[in-house]
Design a protein with these regions (language model features):
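N-terminal Rossmann-like or analogous alpha/beta NTP/dinucleotide-binding catalytic cores
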Residues: 1-137
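Active-site cores that bind ATP or allylic diphosphates and position pyrophosphate for catalysis
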Residues: 107-226
Length: 226
């Protein structure tokens, strides 16, 4: 199995319950497991190198504190594997633009721009547009057979399969077509009742002092689920 977390901020309880805990439950001595810190994916939204580096350390600590066994798992930072980025370019040349046009994250930004009467390409960089190719490289380079994903991420896995299939057909059978392990969606309420998210600034940090934790909990809107 293979999974990663984008290093764009402070890890929180939602990350643990929705990504870290389920992934660790799937791993074990008999499973070849890959867990990575997706610091190049972070560049799509975060332009401050210091914040990305800080997030790398915090998320690494979160994985280790949650019980990741480095003796039986491969644990790495994405940017430390240059072959991932070499493969990204090779796969980019096999990825159809029409396929990337259908990516949910890209389409959502385009739709928002249109609804705001803005240029549909506003605030869209090539990192966002070609994000599925980098994700495909993350998966295919290790010939991962199974990838745990939430329902909203299943499309990324399908796109990786499409890109791998196109490459295999054009050249030779090289890549395993990975299977999705669809995880039950875990929607953890944040401090304001909305889904816990760094974007909403409503998180309960996973790694913090008791004082900080008490302060965060005291902000919870107690009737937010009513």
């Amino acid at each position: 199995i293979l999974t990663g977390i984008t290093t764009t901020g402070t890890p929180h309880i939602g990350n643990y319950l929705g990504a870290i805990k389920p992934a660790l439950e799937l791993s074990g001595p008999e499973t070849e497991s890959y867990f990575f810190l997706a610091d190049y994916h972070a560049l799509i939204k975060q332009t401050d190198p210091a914040l990305i580096q800080s997030s790398v350390k915090d998320i690494a600590l979160a994985w280790l504190a949650s019980g990741l066994d480095t003796e039986h798992s491969n644990f790495y930072r994405q940017s430390d594997i240059p072959e991932v980025h070499e493969l990204t370019w090779v796969l980019t040349c096999s990825a159809a633009k029409g396929l990337l046009n259908r990516a949910h994250a890209y389409k959502a930004v385009v739709a928002e721009n249109i609804s705001n009467d803005a240029d549909e390409d506003k605030a869209i960089n090539m990192g966002l547009f070609s994000y599925p190719v980098l994700m495909a490289a993350d998966i295919l380079i290790f010939n991962a057979t199974h990838v745990p994903v939430g329902p909203d991420q299943a499309q990324h896995l399908e796109m990786a399969r499409d890109i791998a299939g196109k490459f295999n057909h054009t050249y030779k059978s090289t890549f395993v077509l990975p299977e999705a392990l669809i995880q039950n969606e875990v929607s953890v309420p944040g401090l304001d009742g909305r889904k816990m998210s760094k974007s909403y600034k409503n998180i309960i940090p996973f790694l913090c002092t008791e004082k900080v934790l008490q302060k965060a909990i005291s902000r919870i809107i107690t009737n937010s689920l009513e």
